[in-house]
């Protein structure tokens, strides 16, 4: 009986682990998908945005009540945001950290970037911290979840936290 179990387990599907070089190549592909998403978002092209997303997604917005779990909610939220500005210009991705499983099927990326929001002739610059989780499906990386935070300037945060002295 033990021989049969050993034979069955030896013949079963084996997990394929990627080499460190293969992992690095997959991480580059993850960054490409993130950039594709940002370009599509900037161009206000919902069809291209959807091409970067998995079938099931969840997003947390900067508003505490903004939890998006369906494409219908996602489209509604994006279209509302797209009405609030004319263009976004993203800066380079900074402090990029990507964690990936050994098989190259699940990845988490977190990074910072400057973003110029342009409304008419006015430009507002923000520093964003963005986190995304991606999964590989049919040899393509797709975003399954995400969250964006707007970084507050230190002096503003300090003013909120420091109590007044009597």
Predicted regions and their residues:
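A mature extracytoplasmic/lumenal domain signature
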Residues: 53, 63, 102, 111-113, ...
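Second-shell loop/turn segments in exported
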Residues: 20-23, 38-39, 62-67, 120
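Surface-exposed, charged secondary-structure patches
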Residues: 75-120
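Short beta-strand edge/turn micro-motifs at domain boundaries
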Residues: 12-15, 127-157
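Bacterial N-terminal signal peptides
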Residues: 1-8
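Hydrophobic pocket/interface hotspot
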Residues: 37, 49-50, 57, 74, ...
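Short, low-complexity N-terminal intrinsically disordered segments enriched in polar/charged residues
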Residues: 11-51, 161-165
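A short gly/proline-enriched turn/hairpin at secondary-structure junctions
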Residues: 58-69, 82-86
């Amino acid at each position: 009986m033990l021989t049969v179990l050993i034979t069955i387990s030896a013949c079963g599907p084996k997990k394929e682990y990627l080499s460190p070089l293969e992992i690095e190549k997959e991480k580059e592909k993850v960054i490409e998908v993130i950039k594709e998403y940002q370009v599509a978002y900037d161009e206000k092209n919902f069809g291209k945005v959807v091409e970067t997303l998995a079938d099931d997604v969840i997003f947390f917005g900067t508003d505490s009540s903004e939890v998006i779990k369906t494409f219908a909610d996602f489209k509604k939220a994006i279209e509302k945001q797209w009405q609030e500005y004319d263009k976004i210009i993203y800066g380079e991705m900074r402090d990029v950290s990507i964690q990936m499983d050994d098989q190259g099927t699940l990845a988490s990326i977190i990074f910072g970037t400057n973003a110029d929001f342009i409304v008419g002739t006015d430009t507002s610059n923000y520093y964003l911290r963005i986190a995304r989780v991606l999964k590989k499906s049919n040899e393509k990386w797709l975003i399954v979840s995400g969250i964006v935070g707007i970084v507050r300037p230190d002096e503003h945060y300090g003013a909120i936290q420091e109590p007044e002295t009597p």
